Amino acid sequence: MSELTTIARPYAKAAFDFAVEQSAVEKWHEMLAFIAEVAKDEQIQQFLTSSLSPEKVADTVISICGEHLDKSGQNLIRLMAENKRLTVLPAVFNEFRHYMEEYNAIAEVQVISAQPLNATQTDKIAAAMEKRLARKVKLNCSVDNTLIAGVIIRTDDFVIDGSSRGQLNRLANELQ
């Protein structure tokens, strides 16, 4: 687990729990998505690590975000600025998104294929994964020409390697 994730998780969990309590999960998702995009900017990253006081850094970030932050979002920014943790805002958003997907019973599934998949193939994979995971799935498809043929399916819990490259690797291991 990366250090950023370790630092970001408590902030994301607190924000998520607060959002659920306030019935504002979607609003918080949008707020954190915006803040994360702002924090990814190279100039903003340099500013966040500057020697300015935490109050000035927080006030500047809040003014940049403007209407995209409500009072609670501003409080999160102030707290993270006090603790000099504003640079992990993108990781906080990623962790929040994971909590939100878990809450909404959505599993994120990586599908890596040798060739681009058509709609029928992605529908079949989605249906099979929904059945196996007993939840809705969100497919993230990508192409890797080095697979030769087939697909690799990844979730947080397991990997299914149905690629020709994977089969060749397993065969090579058996022969050794």
Curated annotation (Swiss-Prot):
Record's bilayer topology term: Peripheral membrane protein
One GO CC term, this protein: proton-transporting ATP synthase complex
Pfam families, sorted: OSCP
Keyword Lyase: no
GO terms assigned for molecular function: proton-transporting ATP synthase activity, rotational mechanism
Key words, A-Z: ATP synthesis, Cell inner membrane, Cell membrane, CF(1), Hydrogen ion transport, Ion transport, Membrane, Transport
Signal peptide: none
Keyword 4Fe-4S: no
Major subcellular location class: membrane
Location(s) in or outside the cell: Cell inner membrane
Membrane-spanning intervals of the chain: none
UniProt similarity note: Belongs to the ATPase delta chain family.
Oligomeric form and interacting partners: F-type ATPases have 2 components, F(1) - the catalytic core - and F(0) - the membrane proton channel. F(1) has five subunits: alpha(3), beta(3), gamma(1), delta(1), epsilon(1). F(0) has three main subunits: a(1), b(2) and c(10-14). The alpha and beta chains form an alternating ring which encloses part of the gamma chain. F(1) is attached to F(0) by a central stalk formed by the gamma and epsilon chains, while a peripheral stalk is formed by the delta and b chains.
NCBIfam families tied to this protein: ATP_synt_delta, PRK05758.2-2, PRK05758.2-5
Functional description taken from the UniProt entry: F(1)F(0) ATP synthase produces ATP from ADP in the presence of a proton or sodium gradient. F-type ATPases consist of two structural domains, F(1) containing the extramembraneous catalytic core and F(0) containing the membrane proton channel, linked together by a central stalk and a peripheral stalk. During catalysis, ATP synthesis in the catalytic domain of F(1) is coupled via a rotary mechanism of the central stalk subunits to proton translocation.
HAMAP family: ATP_synth_delta_bact (MF_01416)
Name assigned to this protein: ATP synthase subunit delta
Organism of this sequence: Actinobacillus succinogenes (strain ATCC 55618 / DSM 22257 / CCUG 43843 / 130Z)
Organismal lineage: Bacteria, Pseudomonadati, Pseudomonadota, Gammaproteobacteria, Pasteurellales
